[in-house]
Design a protein with these regions (language model features):
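Juxta-kinase regulatory segment immediately upstream of eukaryotic protein kinase catalytic domains
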Residues: 1-15
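ATP-binding glycine-rich loop module of kinase domains
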Residues: 16-59, 65
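Conserved structural core of kinase catalytic domains
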Residues: 65-105
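Short C-lobe core helix of eukaryotic-like protein kinase catalytic domains
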Residues: 108-118
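C-lobe/activation-segment region of protein kinase-like
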Residues: 134, 139-230, 235, 260
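Regulatory extensions appended to serine/threonine kinase catalytic cores
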Residues: 234-263, 267-275, 279, 288
Length: 309
C-alpha cells in the first residue's frame, strides 16, 4: 500500500469488519492482518484538526502508532488506518513482565521518544489506556496518537523533556512506585533511604530539565528488595508479593518527596519552586534559587577542569 494513499470503503463493508474497541470519539475496526481502521464519530470529527493530522501522516516512529492512511467511507473522510498492536494494555501486563525485558523495552522507548522530538511531536492526552505491550516484539507502543501535536516553536530538547515527563508519569503509576501511592510496594520503597534518595534526585532532575529515567528506579528497587529479602525478584509481581508479607512501619523522620500531579507537570519556575518547597519543608526565596543555580554552575565548571586534567 502506497504511503498516504486514501483508502475508500463503503459502510456495508465496514459493518462486516471486526470491532476491536469503542471510545468517546471513535470505533476501531480490524483491517487486514496488520492494520486497524479508526473511524471517527461526530464528536471525533469536531475535534479533528486537519492541519495537524496532515503533519502526523508524514512521520514514522517505532513507539508511536501514528496515523498512516486516510480513510473515506461512502466518499467522505471518516478516519484513518494505523498499525495493529497485538497485545494488551501495559498496565494489565506489567506485573508479569521479566524486569530485564521491561528495562530493555523502556530504554528502546526512550530512544524512540528522543527520535520523535526531532519532528517536534508533542504528546497530547497521553493516558494509561493508550500505552500497550506488543507481545510479538516485547516493546512498548503508544496508540491513540491522532491528537498529538507538531509544534515547531519549541526546541527539540524542550519537546523531548515534555514527552518524557508525560511518559515517565504513566510508567510510575503502572509500576506502582510513585510517592504517595497506596500501601504496598511504593510505600515500602519510599521508607528505604536508598530508594527514597534516588527518587528525590530523579524528581529534582526532571524539574531542572535533566534527562531522568524510570529504569534507574527499577534497578534500585530490585536491589533494595534483594538486599532486604535475599531474593532477586524476576518481575514486579514478585516484588509486591514479598513486600506484602511484611508489616510496613513509616518512620517519623523519613523525608518522602511529594509527587507532582500530572496536571501540574510543567517545568515552570513557579511550579518547580513549589515542589522543592514541598520536598524540603522549607520556603524557598529567590536568593535560594539563585544560590542553587550558582552551585550547579560551579559544579559544572569543576567537572570541566577535572576532565581537562
Amino acid at each position: 500500500m502506497a504511503e498516504n494513499e486514501i483508502i475508500k470503503i463503503n459502510s456495508e463493508k465496514l459493518n462486516r469488519m471486526q470491532v476491536l474497541g469503542r471510545g468517546a470519539c471513535s470505533v476501531v475496526y480490524k483491517y487486514g492482518d496488520n492494520q486497524v481502521i479508526k473511524v471517527l464519530n461526530e464528536s471525533g470529527m469536531k475535534l479533528h484538526n486537519e492541519e495537524q493530522f496532515e503533519q502526523l501522516l508524514r512521520i514514522n516512529n517505532d513507539i508511536c502508532v501514528l496515523p498512516q492512511n486516510k480513510v473515506e467511507i461512502d466518499g467522505k473522510f471518516q478516519g484513518y488506518t494505523m498499525e495493529f498492536v497485538d497485545g494488551q494494555q501495559l498496565q494489565e501486563k506489567i506485573g508479569k513482565i521479566d524486569l530485564d525485558t521491561l528495562i530493555s523495552a523502556i530504554k528502546k522507548a526512550e530512544q524512540d521518544i528522543r527520535n520523535l522530538a526531532q519532528d517536534k511531536v508533542f504528546f497530547q492526552d497521553l493516558n494509561q489506556g493508550g500505552i500497550m505491550w506488543d507481545e510479538k516484539s516485547d516493546r512498548i507502543k503508544i496508540i491513540d496518537t491522532d491528537f498529538f501535536e507538531v509544534n515547531q516553536d519549541f526546541e527539540e530538547e524542550e519537546c523531548f523533556n515534555a514527552n518524557m515527563t508525560s511518559f515517565n508519569t504513566m510508567l510510575e503509576m503502572e509500576l506502582g512506585i510513585m510517592s504517595g501511592q497506596a500501601k504496598g510496594l511504593a510505600e515500602y520503597l519510599h521508607t528505604n533511604p536508598q530508594f527514597s534518595n534516588a527518587y528525590r534526585e530523579y524528581i529534582l532532575g526532571s524539574l531542572m530539565g535533566k534527562e531522568s529515567s524510570v529504569v534507574d528506579l527499577i534497578q534500585i528497587a530490585r536491589e533494595v528488595i534483594e538486599n532486604e529479602f535475599g531474593v532477586i525478584p524476576q518481575n514486579l509481581a514478585e516484588m509486591r508479593e514479598l513486600v506484602g508479607e511484611q508489616e510496613i512501619e513509616i518512620s517519623d523522620v523519613t523525608d518522602t518527596p511529594t509527587f507532582l500531579p500530572p496536571d501540574q507537570q510543567v517545568g515552570t519556575p513557579i511550579l518547580g519552586k513549589q515542589v522543592l518547597e514541598e520536598m524540603s519543608d522549607t520556603q524557598l526565596t529567590d536568593e535560594t534559587e539563585n544560590e542553587m543555580a550558582s552551585q550547579e554552575l560551579e559544579l559544572q565548571q569543576q567537572s570541566s577542569v577535572e576532565q581537562e586534567r
